[in-house]
Amino acid sequence: MNSYYTEENHGPFELINIGPLPLEEGRCMPECLLAVAVHGALNADKSNAILVPTWYSGTSKAMEQIYIGEGRALDPSKYCIIVVNQIGNGLSSSASNTGGSLAGPGFANVRIGDDVSAQHTLLTEYFGIESLALVVGGSMGAQQTYEWAVRYPDFVKRAAAIAGTARNSEHDFLFTEILIEAITTDPAFQAGLYRSSSAVAAGLERHAKLWTLMGWSPEFFRTGRHKALGFESMQMFVDGFMKRYFAPMDPNNLLTMAWKWQRGDVSRHTGGDLAKALGRIKAKTYVMPISHDQFFTVDDCLSEQKMIPNSEFRPLRSIDGHLGLFGTDAQMLDQLDAHLAELLSSPAY
């Protein structure tokens, strides 16, 4: 068990066993544990539920700190905000906390659809929820948001996809492959049988450097945004922020999420026809790319938005790029809150 993945660092959360989970790749998890953090309470008819899935490396604590609060669009005094940690992130069932044949490198290949299926079971059987006022997520959370809206069109009343696409691009697939190789080519990785996460420090450091290169935009560094965050040089930013962020994480967990991220694609439901898949969506949908995102570009997001009925394109302006999702740009968060508040006040489908 990796001591990083504890309530002390990421809590509080509740571990909920939803039972066996058949996976799209053919295996079955004998029991699937979902780490869930709830903010606010359900109203009498349970019509105020909002689902927030997590992104690559992120946990429910980050979602709470960055996006949830009284006076914000995601206001726990008005809504019951249910944050579900994705499978493989270290809090929910993952390579680092599962025994038997699923331990470590034996952990199953999990798809975005498996997360959404598990979340649907959680919401319907544990919470007794029959619809969601909103599903909102960033990056891999956006991938899950799209999967929800396509797979369960009558369940989702509103959807907000932030900095993510419904079908991953070939360019992004390749970049994620390089993230994977940064870890797996470390000799200490030992095919996933490393003695501890810290033993794979060199691989995790390379992984962090790649995230620095693509996660933040060139403009972020050229204009000195890293200095505004307290780092006098790019190297200090890499060492003091990015390497420090990823260093305690379990490599096998990161690989589980990266494999899943690469294969996000709602068109699996329609034989590869993306327009047909997105045409299923009934939810009032806001598509919100980040202007300087190098992973999920504005153009990629716009081309998908045009295929979604009852959708609007609401790009977020931030030179921070994809990792503006970390909440480093207060003006971007203001834009996001305004869009989400507008979406929540609009009629459902």
Swiss-Prot record:
Annotated signal peptide: none
Domain of life: Bacteria
Keyword Chaperone: no
GO molecular function: acyltransferase activity, transferring groups other than amino-acyl groups; hydrolase activity
Observed effect of gene inactivation: Inactivation of the gene abolishes growth on 2-butanone and 2-hexanol. Mutant accumulates ethyl acetate.
EC id: 3.1.1.113
InterPro entries noted in UniProt: AB_hydrolase_1, AB_hydrolase_fold, HAT_MetX-like
Gene3D superfamilies xrefs: alpha/beta hydrolase
UniProt entry tagged with the keyword Protein transport: no
NCBIfam families hit by this protein: PRK07581.1
Subunit structure: Homodimer.
Domain-related comment: The 3D structure excludes the ability of the enzyme to bind homoserine and acetyl-CoA, indicating that it cannot function as a homoserine acetyltransferase.
Family recorded in the similarity comment: Belongs to the AB hydrolase superfamily. Acetyl esterase family.
Protein known as: Ethyl acetate hydrolase
Originating organism: Pseudomonas veronii
Source species taxonomy: Bacteria, Pseudomonadati, Pseudomonadota, Gammaproteobacteria, Pseudomonadales
